[in-house]
UniProtKB/Swiss-Prot annotation:
One of its GO terms (biological process) is cytoplasmic microtubule organization. Its main location: cytoplasm. This is Tubulin gamma chain. GTP binds at A141, G142, G143, T144, G145, S146, G147. Residues 459-468 have a biased composition (Polar residues). Transmembrane segments: none annotated. It comes from Reticulomyxa filosa. Residues 451-478 are annotated as: Disordered.
Length: 478
């Protein structure tokens, strides 16, 4: 039985990515823009029901919520060729339409005011036979995707504690390209929720997206549509085994379990090859299994700008699509081991996992074999350290804090900033510890320390001193 997934598209970036994603999915499942299955695709063995459900007239509707605080992007979707694809009851645009002003706290406050309405939308969508979890698409740099998305993560954790929460989170540029001057504040506040409330976070780094567009696709300056097309390619590829199941990784739990051996270090990097999008120059290349698997490991193809030559891989999953002989997989893995291309953790299994999946029979692709890598790497901690450094630059100058102090979240103090920084700093330390052979002992000591802190907090409450305690890290009181 298919395990259903509800997609939550939040903010401008989240909705633009989501639209590209659904465009790929309907092409791969032989569904038209109106949700009607094309005649040649009626007898397929693919699992459409994972991401779609059928209306009474048999047309397919995405299991998706479209959420934004300003109307421009969603209105454009409702006027596009996909206007009849969405369920109009699953669209939320703030009645005032003013947006969040690139302010995490404004987005978060809006969500606290509207969360019952949003949760009712999700509860109504949760009419599936076997809901497995949620996929959130958003940016952490702006106001709606970061702030509204943060509150949704907290509420989903509270209301659906046994469901998987995976995100595709776009991280800001670390260069002059970033147009949101307060993105370090927004990123730190959103990243705290991604650490505490998500089961897996696929990191999409804008810096790497533009580099890939410049170098691999030879686009002088990639548009949002082109970078979003790259992201949607990875999203579609990473969900292939859920929609075209094989022998392994047929559900979200299995997919994440193979990549996230420890609860907090659940951030993932990706790569895809061969990468082909509209508007970009095509390069004819060899697509043997070995060639694809080696290209997936090349730093220039990885969509996070933290490097992989130093540090270690915690886990790697290669999803290979096409008409592939399993013996080619074994030979390719052996060649990669012989050349010592990959450095793994010293305290766990050192192997690349491979999942095979069919190409969609309905979508024309210009290559015989394609691959998507999802990997957990210790150098992701460097990305978070970079965010903390940019945050510290603003925070030491107390720059732009007035717009945050005007919101209920920060009306009394700025403690939430420091709490978020502490949460991220702890994760950075964990990624450093992951590289050592003593990581398991380190983790046990950290766990014991947390237990001791909880016991001390409980004792303080019993003595009547609990009134000064701050709210728990997984939720925040207003």
């Amino acid at each position: 039985m298919p395990r259903e997934i509800i997609t939550l598209q939040v903010g401008q970036c989240g909705n633009q990515i989501g639209t590209e994603f659904w465009g790929r999915l309907i092409a791969e499942h032989g569904i038209g823009p109106d949700g009607i299955v094309k005649e040649f695709a009626t007898e397929g063995t693919d699992r459409k029901d994972v991401f779609f459900y059928q209306a009474d007239d048999q047309h397919y509707i995405p299991r998706a919520l479209l959420i934004d605080l300003e109307p421009r992007v969603i209105n454009s979707l409702q006027e596009s060729e996909f206007k009849n694809l969405w369920n109009p009851e699953n669209v939320y645009i703030d009645s005032q339409g003013g947006g969040a002003g690139n302010n995490w706290a404004v987005g978060y406050t809006h969500a606290t005011e509207k969360y019952e309405h949003i949760m009712d939308m999700i509860d109504r969508e949760d009419n599936s036979d076997s809901l497995e979890g949620f996929v959130l698409t958003h940016s952490i740099a702006g106001g709606t995707g970061s702030g509204f998305g943060s509150h949704m993560l907290e509420q989903l954790t509270d209301r659906y504690p046994k469901k998987i929460i995976q995100t595709y989170s776009v991280f800001p540029n670390d260069s002059e390209r970033s147009s949101v001057v307060v993105h370090p504040y927004n990123s730190v506040l959103a990243l705290k929720r991604l650490i505490l409330n998500a089961d897996a976070v696929v990191v999409i780094d804008n810096t790497s997206l533009h580099r890939i567009a410049d170098e691999r696709l030879q686009l002088d300056f990639a548009s949002f549509k082109e970078t979003n097309s790259i992201i949607s390619t990875v999203m579609a590829a990473s969900t292939t085994t859920l929609r075209y199941p094989g022998y392994m990784n047929n559900d979200l739990v299995g997919l994440i379990a193979s990549l996230v051996p420890t609860p907090r270090a659940h951030f993932l990097m990706t790569s895809f090859t061969p990468l082909v999008i509209k508007g970009a120059q095509r390069r004819i290349q060899k697509t043997s299994v070995l060639d694809v698997m080696r290209r997936l490991l090349q730093p220039k193809n990885i969509m996070v700008s933290c490097g992989t030559k130093k540090g270690v891989y915690v886990s790697i999953l290669d999803i290979i699509r096409g008409d592939v002989d399993p013996t080619d997989i074994h030979k390719s893995l052996q060649r990669i081991r012989e050349k010592k291309i990959v450095n793994f953790i010293p305290w766990g299994p050192a192997s690349i996992q491979v999942a095979l999946s069919k190409q969609s029979p309905y979508a024309n692709v210009p290559y015989r074999v394609s691959g998507c890598m999802m990997a957990n790497h210790s150098n992701l901690g460097n990305l978070f350290a970079r965010i903390i450094r940019t945050y510290d630059i603003l925070r030491k100058r107390n720059a732009f804090l007035n717009v945050y102090k005007e919101t209920p979240v920060f009306s009394e103090n700025l403690d939430e900033f420091e709490d978020a920084k502490e949460t991220i700093t702890n994760l950075i330390e964990e990624y450093k510890a992951i590289q050592t052979s003593d990581y398991i002992n380190w983790g046990m000591k950290q766990q014991q320390s947390q237990i001791s802190q909880k016991e001390s907090s409980s004792l303080a409450n019993e003595n009547g001193n609990g009134a000064n305690n701050k709210p728990g890290k997984s939720a925040m009181a207003l």
